[in-house]
Amino acid sequence: MIRIGIAGLGAAGRAFVPAIRINAAFDLRAIADPSPEIRAEFAGTAAVHPHLEAMLGDRALDAVCIATPTEMHAAQACAAFAAGKHVVLEKPMATSIADAQRIIEASERAGKVLLVGHSHSYDAPIARMRALVEEGTLGAPRMANTWCFTDWVYRPRRPEELDVAKGGGVTFRQGAHQLDILRLLCGGRAASVRAKTFDFDPSRSTVGAHVVFVDFAGGAAGTAVYSGYGHLPFGELTFGIGEWGFPQPAPVQSSAKAPASVEEERRAKAQRAKNAIPAKAPHPPFFGMTILSCERGDVRQTPEGLAVHTREGVSTIRVSAERSPRDLLFDELRDAIEGVRPPIHDGRWALATLELCIGALESSRIGREIALVHQCAPVRRVVL
């Protein structure tokens, strides 16, 4: 039994809870959060602490999930490794390459597992696409394109979530999903990135949209398009299915609205976090629409899984919605801790994705292509 704790019980941290509780390999032993209300909510089912440092004093704890603000990740992950814990670190991994490297070095010194996620590259349809690439029946991947349109900018946010210097804005927080997907499908080793980012609303200033072009070392190319301004409804590209696999009601009007006060927004975010990421769904998750083009066919997501288009016609692959992406994350963590197989989403994989996010922002700032130096391929094949 792997005894695990969670630091930070916002939407991301809460989404870990059901995935841990249904996995027989794990025991949710503790949580850490500065909110007295959240600690009271979990009291009786787990030990509660006001902060990660207090939780790390539990010598029986084997691992921690860190879902705190991004600017805290480096110090907290290093402290967890120093305390002898395995670490699951929410994306984005850090706010700088230097901090990400510090985290990796700390994990290697401690000899402990570092897993970075959840990322939508864990999604079962994306993993199945990668398996098609590995099987080789469609030939080499040549293009991967992913598009996502949401109201991300206008959802309740902490101030740092909109501050790019602190890992905020859609390129860090949502591009980390998209670029992870592109890397997994195209072999991981991006050579360069060219991007344009946008701030459409000065009253809610942040990087709220982007177009990113990635050139891969193996000859493939990928694009990521994201807008968080609540114009085009999410479900228009996803057969009416939302990010987590539930039917997405068509909005009667734009969700864009003026932000509330900081305190009101914090309260709204805390309330939304309780149900923002459901555990089970009738369909596989959709992070927008992703289409993979190989030499002998194109693959796209469908409500049931994948459609494979070739010269011979269209075939379908059913993908189970039984297990959530976070269920799959904890399988990967369990296997890594128990020595069954190394994790794909380890520190060096996450560093490469972070480099792409930072490179996209820098490319937009200076108006030219950015060469990449920290890229890597997946360490193994996907497990379906």
What function would you assign to each model-found segment?
Residues 1-43:
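N-terminal Rossmann-like dinucleotide-binding module
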Residues 16, 46-106, 384:
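Beta-loop-alpha module in the N-terminal Rossmann-like domain of NAD(P)-dependent dehydrogenases
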Residues 30, 63, 143:
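Short, Asp-centered acidic motifs that coordinate Mg2+ and/or phosphate
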Residues 39, 76, 103, 129, ...:
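Aromatic/hydrophobic pocket-lining residues that form π-stacking "cages" and hydrophobic walls in ligand
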Residues 63-65, 267, 272-276, 281-283, ...:
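C-terminal helix-rich "cap/oligomerization" subdomain common to oxidoreductases
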Residues 84, 158-166, 311-315:
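Short glycine/proline- and charge-enriched loop/turn segments
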Residues 113, 120-224, 229-245, 367:
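Predominantly a Rossmann-like dinucleotide-binding segment in NAD(P)-dependent oxidoreductases
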Residues 202-207, 217-329:
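NAD(P)-dinucleotide binding in Rossmann-like oxidoreductases
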